[in-house]
Amino acid sequence: MKSQEITKRWIDFFVSKGHTAVPSASLVSSDPSLLFTVAGMVPFIPYLTAREEAPYNRATSVQKCIRTGDIEEVGKTARHGTFFQMCGNFSFGDYFKEDAIKFAWELLTTSVDDGGYGLPPEKLWVTVYEEDDEAEQLWLKNTGMPAERIQRMGKADNYWSTGQPGPAGPCSEIYYDRGPSYGVEGGPIADENRYVEIWNLVFMQYQIDNVRSKVDFDITGELPKKNIDTGLGMERLAMILQDVENMYETDQVRPVIDKAAALSGKEYTSAESADDPHHTDDVRMRVVADHIRSALMLIADGVTPSNEGRGYVLRRLIRRAVRSMRLLGVEKACLPDLLPASRDAMKGVYPVVETDFDRISRIAYAEEKAFLRTIASGTARLEDAVKDSKAAGQPLSGADAFALHDTYGFPIDLTLEMAEEAGLKVDEPEFRKLMLEQRQRAQADAKGKKGSHADLSAFQELLAEGETVFTGYTELAGESKVRGILSGGRKVSQASTGEEIELVLAETPFYAEAGGQAADTGLITGDGFVVEVLDVQRPVKGLSVHKAIVREGEIGADSLVQAAVDRERRHSAEQAHTGTHIVHAALHQILGPEALQRGSYNKAGYLRFDFAWGEGLSAATRSEIEEVSNLAIRNNFQVETKVMALAEAKALGAMALFGENYGNEVRVVEIDGAWSRELCGGTHVANTSLIGSLSLLGDQSVGSGNRRVEAFVGMEAFRHLAAERALVTELTEMLKVPSGLLADRIATTLTKLKTVEKELERLRKEQLTAAAAQLVGTAKDAAGVKVIAHDAGQVSGADDLRGLALDLRTRLGSEAAAVAVAGVSNDRPVILVATNEAARAAGVKAGALVRLAAGILGGGGGGKDDVAQGGGTDAAKVPAALTAVVDAITRR
């Protein structure tokens, strides 16, 4: 049975049981705590946790999901994959355990001819929570399953909760017995390779509190409305129904494996044992197939490669796939062959991968191209690092490996492999330490951004009393009432002068940071108190929280207030936000519709806009964008907002940010009608002339395939242009030319400077040659070896010392000779030793001498027997280091 038929039967069955068919949500989760939709129940969390009223009592879906926590295990087992489809049925206070069990059994065991999946009942096993006698009895009563095929497990396996206080309940899991060739008998408890879990039924019936761990919490009572949340892994069921070894060989994945095999000339053998000689290649082909499919689906849902968040996950998937193909022997670009194979396998269920394939493929191919460039440039840098490490007689440092990984995106496994080929080890502990420190910095940064919003329970309580009404679209001041005051994340009854608080009002004109627009600031005043609003956030949907400080008096938890937004700052922010829409429209007009928005930020007087584009903008293009934007401002276009259905907005061609989740009703901002039409919840000027002017600052890369433009608007644009004019005036006075001739004068000056630098370089080399001629006469005998030890003083770099040392070695002839020259470059001592063949035969080795000298200098070094280089931190020890070299040659 094909995957498309499996999902169709699922939906048809549950619709026949009174369920509403709900389309799959985006892979980009609407839950801000999740990067991706990781389970079928994620879109239904607000209903399952009673935060929102469900619009239906019963629902069913086939949900696209992404999980990358076990990405290193992909391809090695039959159970791990990054993209999967979760078939689910849900009840919100309607049916409960018995019907959930009956539905599952009926669909699984009904014959194929009668619309079911036709699984043999004797192949099915069930687990229940060890204390859930009711579930076991319902299985026995409704299915006729023998008691010996029902096994009990503990909380770790068969109990569901969010890990926070709230709803929870036992689960019951259904397993399929693949037969004795896959492992020992004895049910799921004995062997989960033989007994594959296909369906999990979660019975949400309890309220829990005092959660100490996943298995340690207090059950405080039963839920007033009991819910059902089930999930069946479509790929696992397809594996069974299609009688293949693992989920990589199902109809939606196997075509990519076949294409990878054809491109590489390798044979795919379904090897799962690490002892099988084909196992390594088979794992690589499975990784390719899995990751290509995941990348296809992520890009279809609006994710683009970047260095953080969802974009980083996508980038890693693509690069792991490309890397796996290289390990299979394919070094050319391979996505143009692999991605269409995945598209053709998935388009029956997800038509968008075909209709939007031009955009999807453009993004994927650009990322592969960039990665191949990364490998080329990274290889050159790695070869330099390997050369230096070998010269120093040291392993490749973890710092070098980290720099390659962090700066150039060079995979650590590739670094390890290439270092091994060069006969070097890599300091992996240091690399892992640096990676850990980077993660800790990122986590600390994320924690800092969350601030007191890390615990949302107090805000959830306030939200239960009603959402904050936002009045700031039409007014910037108004009366309101305090709904709650928080200090340190806890509700308090009052706050006094100097206290930093979080304030919730019944209604507010203050705009909370959202959609790239910075929050409003201003004052909240009342009877005897003044509170300054510094920031406004929405830690939970529907609740505006004012971060503030009490400047005067005492504010109470039920005070009546006057809320007043800083009008000038809001106007400047509106200039920037409307300016952002104008720049977006200008980019589309000049570059084309493929310049898709990737993100934006605007605050008083300033905007930045990120968009999909693979190369830097020329000066002429930047000027054109700036001109089109300012013409739109001068044309006094009307800016209008409309609220409409999402479908209507899309039909009108309104632009939306890919990856964002929108409700059924959206706010559309139009500039001169269709000239610019975007989904947007921000605030804007009434007409474009109120912006005044826009000054583009330039563009820069913000990750592979993405660019960023920045601009000032309004008075900030004026100040920026005034500062540039002042700079031009200063330069014209300094260079004594009119502004129109500045560029020519600067070019002429730079040409002269380069000529002077070349002359200085020539003179420096002449000085070194002259010095060598003089120094050769200073050679001393050290136990039969002619030795020159010279302190060159300040030098431009190690190359100066190398040239001098090699020149001196040549001048000393074929008799045993060694040269040690040292100097100071950028306040750090450098030493270089060179020996000739006769000296080396006499036991004088440059590498050993440099290590000795560098140790005295407070550093390290090494190299070959004929030439070696080192350095340190203590420039005052240069004479002592040179003396030590001479003494070592004498004592050898």
UniProtKB/Swiss-Prot annotation:
<comment type="similarity">
    <text>Belongs to the class-II aminoacyl-tRNA synthetase family.</text>
</comment>
<dbReference type="InterPro" id="IPR018164">
    <property type="entry name" value="Ala-tRNA-synth_IIc_N"/>
</dbReference>
<feature type="binding site">
    <location>
        <position position="581"/>
    </location>
    <ligand>
        <name>Zn(2+)</name>
    </ligand>
</feature>
<keyword id="KW-0030">Aminoacyl-tRNA synthetase</keyword>
<feature type="binding site">
    <location>
        <position position="680"/>
    </location>
    <ligand>
        <name>Zn(2+)</name>
    </ligand>
</feature>
<feature type="binding site">
    <location>
        <position position="577"/>
    </location>
    <ligand>
        <name>Zn(2+)</name>
    </ligand>
</feature>
<dbReference type="InterPro" id="IPR003156">
    <property type="entry name" value="DHHA1_dom"/>
</dbReference>
<keyword id="KW-0648">Protein biosynthesis</keyword>
<feature type="binding site">
    <location>
        <position position="684"/>
    </location>
    <ligand>
        <name>Zn(2+)</name>
    </ligand>
</feature>
<keyword id="KW-0547">Nucleotide-binding</keyword>
<protein>
    <recommendedName>
        <fullName>Alanine--tRNA ligase</fullName>
        <ecNumber>6.1.1.7</ecNumber>
    </recommendedName>
</protein>
<dbReference type="InterPro" id="IPR023033">
    <property type="entry name" value="Ala_tRNA_ligase_euk/bac"/>
</dbReference>
<keyword id="KW-0862">Zinc</keyword>
<dbReference type="GO" id="GO:0004813">
    <property type="term" value="F:alanine-tRNA ligase activity"/>
</dbReference>
<keyword id="KW-0067">ATP-binding</keyword>
<keyword id="KW-0436">Ligase</keyword>
<comment type="function">
    <text>Catalyzes the attachment of alanine to tRNA(Ala) in a two-step reaction: alanine is first activated by ATP to form Ala-AMP and then transferred to the acceptor end of tRNA(Ala). Also edits incorrectly charged Ser-tRNA(Ala) and Gly-tRNA(Ala) via its editing domain.</text>
</comment>
<keyword id="KW-0963">Cytoplasm</keyword>
<dbReference type="Pfam" id="PF02272">
    <property type="entry name" value="DHHA1"/>
</dbReference>
<dbReference type="Pfam" id="PF07973">
    <property type="entry name" value="tRNA_SAD"/>
</dbReference>
<dbReference type="InterPro" id="IPR002318">
    <property type="entry name" value="Ala-tRNA-lgiase_IIc"/>
</dbReference>
<dbReference type="InterPro" id="IPR018162">
    <property type="entry name" value="Ala-tRNA-ligase_IIc_anticod-bd"/>
</dbReference>
<keyword id="KW-0820">tRNA-binding</keyword>
<dbReference type="GO" id="GO:0000049">
    <property type="term" value="F:tRNA binding"/>
</dbReference>
<dbReference type="GO" id="GO:0002161">
    <property type="term" value="F:aminoacyl-tRNA deacylase activity"/>
</dbReference>
<dbReference type="InterPro" id="IPR012947">
    <property type="entry name" value="tRNA_SAD"/>
</dbReference>
<dbReference type="InterPro" id="IPR009000">
    <property type="entry name" value="Transl_B-barrel_sf"/>
</dbReference>
<dbReference type="GO" id="GO:0005524">
    <property type="term" value="F:ATP binding"/>
</dbReference>
<dbReference type="Pfam" id="PF01411">
    <property type="entry name" value="tRNA-synt_2c"/>
</dbReference>
<dbReference type="GO" id="GO:0006419">
    <property type="term" value="P:alanyl-tRNA aminoacylation"/>
</dbReference>
<dbReference type="GO" id="GO:0005829">
    <property type="term" value="C:cytosol"/>
</dbReference>
<dbReference type="GO" id="GO:0008270">
    <property type="term" value="F:zinc ion binding"/>
</dbReference>
<dbReference type="InterPro" id="IPR045864">
    <property type="entry name" value="aa-tRNA-synth_II/BPL/LPL"/>
</dbReference>
<dbReference type="InterPro" id="IPR050058">
    <property type="entry name" value="Ala-tRNA_ligase"/>
</dbReference>
<keyword id="KW-0694">RNA-binding</keyword>
<keyword id="KW-0479">Metal-binding</keyword>
<dbReference type="InterPro" id="IPR018165">
    <property type="entry name" value="Ala-tRNA-synth_IIc_core"/>
</dbReference>
<dbReference type="InterPro" id="IPR018163">
    <property type="entry name" value="Thr/Ala-tRNA-synth_IIc_edit"/>
</dbReference>
